[in-house]
């Protein structure tokens, strides 16, 4: 098992600052949609050989053309998608006992069309 990568374009309203400014009903709908998207994308990427690991590494890379999210905003924006990956069985849970390595990074791209966020889940095999 190498890992599973899903690619999303998170709504800026899901960032920490965006959620703070948004109406609670709008936020609830955005979160539910992002979670469902994570579930569907996870199912698309999962194959029959995938076994839900007890412990995993999660790597998040934001590809941005103009201004990147702050790391706390990026973590907040992808949280519902990660919940969807838990729902579909890619991750056992999203607590520290199951996600033992969590990496965030940015990568500059040339055009707005290239803006995206990738979430890669890799199993951590036991000793």
Model region roles, listed by residue range:
Residues 1-127:
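Catalytic phosphate/metal-binding cores of nucleic-acid and nucleotide-processing enzymes, i.e., regions
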């Amino acid at each position: 098992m190498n890992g599973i990568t899903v690619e999303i374009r998170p709504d800026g309203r899901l960032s920490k600052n965006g959620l703070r400014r948004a109406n609670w009903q709008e936020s609830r709908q955005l979160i539910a949609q992002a979670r469902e998207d994570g579930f569907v994308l996870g199912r698309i990427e999962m194959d029959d050989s995938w076994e839900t690991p007890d412990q995993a590494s999660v790597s998040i890379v934001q590809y941005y053309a103009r201004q990147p999210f702050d790391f706390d905003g990026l973590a907040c924006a992808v949280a519902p998608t990660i919940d969807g990956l838990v729902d579909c069985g890619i991750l056992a849970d999203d607590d520290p006992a199951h996600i033992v390595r969590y990496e965030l990074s940015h990568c500059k791209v040339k055009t707005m069309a290239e803006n995206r966020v990738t979430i890669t889940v890799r199993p951590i095999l036991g000793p």
